[in-house]
Curated annotation (Swiss-Prot):
Binding-site list for Mg(2+) 2: D249, D723
Protein name stated in the entry: Pyrophosphate-energized vacuolar membrane proton pump
Main location: membrane
Tagged with keyword Transferase: no
EC number, UniProt record: 7.1.3.1
Family recorded in the similarity comment: Belongs to the H(+)-translocating pyrophosphatase (TC 3.A.10) family. K(+)-stimulated subfamily.
Residues that coordinate or bind substrate: K246, K726
Length: 762
């Protein structure tokens, strides 16, 4: 038996979750002390008010009431635009939730003809609860997961729009103060999301347990709906937010920077507010929902496999909750790690920012390895058995620790390889920048080659972690490796959210007409944020591959498939169709960004041509029209990709059966991961090649610049092509592979009973 008793588990998990939420609120309270509203005395000429505290001595001349007012106005415009978009999207997503909840109930309830009689359990002796009740609880957990995901995304966006202007104003004190404000704000989102995800899942398990009692097989099967709800909302957040942000970004860049030769975030550009809104709805709300979905799904996959292993059969609640205990330890580890950035060390110069963020990843991974070792010793029996395709495999507690540790360190390796290929501090991006000498075509060729090459090491890291974890603990080992990769999610999310907050802060500084030296500081924050955003995408894609495989294993077990035979025609046709789906999905999202950007370009050109004095800065552009174009386009364009992902498992499972569906899932996983990594890294490299030329921090960079040169224009074109790759198609693909797998798992009993209708008549 485990050292940690059931009572200890019941205390430890919610306490860690609550500590995470309290820490998030404390960070928010500290950020809120930075005031964006000028004091009453600040309007008086020469008045010495509190705002004098902001300014470093040589910039005392900037103690200007108007700067603070402008920052507040811009922040309000960005916040209102983001809120408006999310509420519009949530109306459509709400309708989808209701319809899909009804489908879950009808499909799963029909397995035993809506009977209320108990049935013999599949994997353990005894009677399990009726399928009708499992259908009801699966529907409830789907709605809970969906609502938690939506609330997490919304709160993340609210925090980011609350923090952006505060980061700008703190930049007047120095780069260190601005960094801490942006990072604390990111930490609010990271801890709020990871802690609330854990607490809601734990409460759901305990509430469902009141009904299910000893039927843990049915209990954890119904919990899988939580992962499906979280990930389906993430799909719409990522795709809708990605289309929104990139339509605005491409439109603003093409007309503003290439045609009109005005700087990024120039207030004369009509698309500039839409562009800044997009950073929040795509990179904050979408990314938060994405990682929440990964966490929920890997937990569900581990719980489903554990419920039919010795943990579930022997009703060992502490060992059963091992995935949740790992996440609980992760919250405490991330809390300690965050203090290193905010309290123990101070950033004094711009070149200290990126190392500080990288240290966060290394410290959290090292501490988490120790934490997992301790919890594996306390929570797991010395020996236990894990379900492995019809047989039980004996595993030790240290074996399972090794599975989690392999996933944890594989995530760090993927993160740093991603950084190597996307940071302009290293030769790959510098080579891409150098290729701009001969125009945009060579820039595109070099960027694509970099993206394809960047797939190699992450895939080997994923392959090694799959082989090691499967050899030790079968599919449960893979699920725990995925959870290991996601165990430092609070720190990962804090670093990820820091990027868009810094980006917005730079935009606000430019629009408020602040000193170029303030802009240099926000640019330094943004440059580090760009690299860490690429690292975050690497984590998301790597964890998605492991999560998808773990869900695939749970689906195959639940559907009663003994072996997936690639030589079987039923499986093979699924395999090649599944491998095609990421291309179809990417085509839809890329085209959506392109068509939305076309409308945006036309509108921006129209305003420059028809509004007198706009180019001279004497007239204001119509920001609202551009915001509306992005909102309408993203809502309309997110439906077809969403339908493709949600309907494919239902159609394939019902018409062709579980064997073909298992082929589709395997094919989508194999091709989707490769495209996602290459798309994200290609786009990230083009973006940083452009920034490398703009910054001109080395002799080589200065030989390619300055802004407005032919080299720079070629780099801007590459960056514009890369925008939808790195922020729409690439990140959305990891949701495609996870979502199809978790949906197949939820509907597995229905497909096993009624699936393969077409083959029955052929």
């Amino acid at each position: 038996m485990a050292i940690l008793g059931e009572l200890g588990t019941e205390i430890l998990i919610p306490v860690c979750g609550v500590i995470g939420i309290v820490f998030a609120v404390a960070q928010w309270f500290i950020v809120s002390k930075v005031k964006v509203t000028p004091g009453a005395a600040s309007a008086a000429a020469g008045a010495k008010n509190g705002y004098g505290d902001y300014l470093i001595e040589e910039e005392e001349g900037l103690n200007d009431h108007n700067v603070v007012v402008k920052c507040a106005e811009i922040q309000t415009a960005i916040s209102e635009g983001a809120t408006s978009f999310l509420f519009t999207m949530y109306q459509y997503v709400g309708m989808f939730m209701v319809v899909f909840a009804a489908i879950i109930f009808l499909f799963l309830g029909s397995i035993e003809g809506f009977s209320t009689k108990g049935q013999p359990c599949t994997y353990s002796k005894g009677t399990c609860k009726p399928a009708l009740y499992t259908a009801l609880f699966s529907t409830a957990s789907f709605l809970l997961g969906a609502i938690t995901s939506l609330v997490s995304g919304f709160l993340g966006m609210k925090i980011a729009t609350y923090a952006n202007a505060r980061t700008t104003l703190e930049a007047r004190k120095g780069v260190g103060k601005a960094f801490i404000t942006a990072f604390r704000s990111g930490a609010v989102m990271g801890f709020l999301l990871s802690s609330s995800g854990l607490v809601v899942l734990y409460i759901t398990i305990n509430v469902f347990k009141m009904y299910y009692g000893d039927d843990w097989e049915g209990l954890f099967e119904s919990i899988t709906g939580y992962g499906l709800g979280g990930s389906s909302m993430a799909l719409f957040g990522r795709v809708g937010g990605g289309i929104y942000t990139k339509a605005a970004d491409v439109g603003a860049d093409l007309v503003g920077k290439v045609e009109r030769n005005i700087p990024e975030d120039d207030p004369r550009n009509p698309a500039v507010i839409a562009d800044n809104v997009g950073d929040n709805v795509g990179d904050i709300a979408g990314m938060g929902s994405d990682l929440f979905g990964s966490y929920a799904e890997s937990s569900c996959a581990a719980l489903v496999v554990a419920s039919i292993s010795s943990f579930g059969i022997n009703h060992d609640f502490t060992a059963m909750c091992y995935p949740l205990l790992v996440s609980s330890v992760g919250i405490i580890v991330c809390l300690l790690t965050t203090l290193f950035a905010t309290d123990f060390f101070e950033i004094k110069a711009a070149n200290e920012i990126e190392p500080a963020l990288k240290k966060q990843l290394i410290i959290s991974t090292a501490l988490m390895t120790v934490g997992v070792a301790v919890i594996s010793w306390l929570a797991l029996p010395a020996k236990f058995t894990i379900f492995n395709f019809g047989a039980q495999k004996e595993v030790s507690n240290w074996g399972l620790f090794f599975c989690v540790a392999v996933g944890l360190w594989a995530g760090l390796i993927i993160g740093f390889v991603t950084e190597y290929y996307t940071s302009n501090a290293y030769s790959p991006v510098q080579d891409v920048a150098d290729s701009c000498r001969t125009g945009a075509a060579t820039n595109v060729i070099f960027g694509l080659a970099l993206g394809y090459k960047s797939v190699i090491i992450p895939i080997f890291a994923i392959a090694v972690s799959i082989y090691v974890s499967f050899s030790i603990a079968a599919m449960y080992g893979i699920a725990m490796a995925a959870l290991g990769m996601l165990s430092t999610m609070a720190t990962g999310l804090a670093i990820d959210a820091y990027g868009p907050i810094s980006d917005n802060a730079g935009g606000i500084a430019e629009m408020a007409g602040m000193s170029h030296r303030i802009r240099e500081r926000t640019d330094a924050l943004d440059a580090a944020g760009n690299t860490t955003a690429a690292i975050g995408k690497g984590f998301a894609i790597g964890s998605a591959a492991l999560v998808s495989l773990a869900l695939f294993g749970a689906f195959v077990s639940r559907a009663g498939v003994k072996v997936v035979d690639v030589l079987s025609p039923k499986v093979f046709i699924g395999l090649i169709v599944g491998a095609m789906l990421p291309y179809w999905f990417s085509a839809m999202t890329m085209k959506s960004v392109g068509s939305a950007a076309l409308k945006m370009v036309e509108e921006v050109r129209r305003q420059f041509n028809t509004i007198p004095g706009l180019m001279e800065g004497t007239a204001k552009p119509d920001y609202a029209t551009c915001v509306k174009i992005s909102t309408d386009a993203s809502i309309k364009e997110m439906i077809p990709p969403g339908a493709l992902v949600m309907l494919t498992p239902l159609i394939v499972g019902t018409l062709f059966g579980v064997e073909t569906l298992s082929g589709v899932l395997a094919g989508a996983l194999v091709s989707g991961v490769q495209i996602a990594i290459s798309a994200s890294n290609t786009g990230g490299a083009w973006d940083n090649a452009k920034k490398y030329i703009e910054a001109g921090n080395s002799e080589h960079a200065r030989s390619l610049g300055p802004k407005g040169s032919d080299c720079h224009k070629a780099a801007v074109i590459g960056d514009t092509i890369g925008d939808p790759l790195k922020d729409t198609s690439g990140p959305s693909l990891n949701i495609l592979i996870k979502l199809m797998a978790v949906e197949s798992l939820v509907f597995a009993p229905f497909f096993a009973t009624y699936g393969g209708l077409l083959f029955k008549y052929i």
